[in-house]
Design a protein with these regions (language model features):
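Sequence signature of WD/YWTD-type beta-propeller architectures
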Residues: 1-295
Length: 295
């Protein structure tokens, strides 16, 4: 099935994580097959399917295809992955490639690789997506077969972006990008073993540290609409950090562990407000509430 659907910057496409039901069923009888999570996308385009009476097969307004390649047993030290997850669209209109041309649709995601020690670590990946995902390379099957998972559409290019000793770390988070597509933000450990925010270009290259806090980040990150700040929870408080200045600002006083904010800190569309969750203790019971910070 599909999970965690996200609109593209132009509001036309949708990305999501995907597990193939046929492969999941096959894995119960074939030990060589595993139920692997991957990334897929939907584009506008009517789809008609036969009605089999189960109410499981329905006509639709969007066409879907898998856009990340996963494999059961990634070879150590390679770019092969056995899980693609926690993705985000790159930029509001894609990103500019090193040659100056524009890739109009692309997704950044976390991919689980095996390092030289055969340990699983997550790295940043990018998949470039063509304007039409209804076509497949010769010999391929977009829908998959009874024994193979769906193939990628023709023109999809998957690339590994980061090559780090320990990979992505920290609380679960979806990769975020600036609206111009120039930066992908993710979390990893710094030299002091503290979870910080880092950035990298979708074209690859050097990784830059964004936050320099004395404590680890506690939840997902989000970028302000003007691309100036990243918001997150840390030290039981709401924080923002300048992406270019690296200056961090505590926006709420430090809460107790029982009443600490948690989850993602969400920007309003105009960047003038932040929304977050925090527990309030009433009669010794915790109740999750929504809070707003307004400029």
């Amino acid at each position: 099935g599909t999970h965690a659907h996200t609109w593209s910057g132009d509001g036309q496409w949708i990305s999501f994580t995907y597990n193939d039901y046929i492969m999941e069923q096959l894995s119960k009888t074939d030990s060589a097959v595993k139920d692997l999570r991957t990334i897929a996308a939907m584009m506008p385009g009517k789809v008609s399917v036969p009605d089999d009476g189960t109410m499981e097969n329905n006509n639709g307004e969007y066409f879907s295809a898998v856009v990340a390649r996963v494999t059961e047993n990634p070879a150590p030290g390679t770019d092969e992955i056995d899980k693609a997850f926690d993705e985000g669209w790159i930029g509001s209109k894609g990103y500019q490639k090193a040659d100056g041309s524009w890739q109009h649709r692309a997704i950044a995601f976390q991919g689980n690789v095996r390092n030289e020690k055969n340990e699983t670590i997550a790295e940043v990946f990018v998949t470039d997506i063509p304007d039409d995902i209804t076509k497949v390379s010769p010999g391929g099957h977009l829908e998959g077969t009874a024994h193979t998972r769906p193939d990628l559409p023709a023109g999809v290019v998957q690339r590994r972006i980061t090559r780090t000793p320990e990979g992505i770390h920290g609380p679960r988070h979806w990769l975020r990008t600036t609206s111009d597509g120039a930066l992908i933000l993710f979390m990893a450990k710094d030299s002091k073993n503290i979870i910080q925010v880092f950035s990298v270009s979708p074209n690859g290259g050097s990784i830059k540290q964004i936050t320099f806090n004395d404590f680890s980040i506690q939840g997902p990150l989000n970028i302000s609409p003007d691309d100036q700040y990243v918001s997150y929870i840390a030290d039981n408080s709401v924080f923002i950090t300048g992406i270019q200045t690296h200056t961090s600002e505590r926006l709420t006083s430090r809460s107790t562990d029982k009443e600490a904010p948690f989850g993602a800190v969400i920007w309003s569309n105009n960047g003038q407000a932040l929304a977050f969750n925090r527990r309030i203790i009433k009669e010794e019971k915790p109740y999750i509430q929504i809070f707003l910070l307004k400029q």
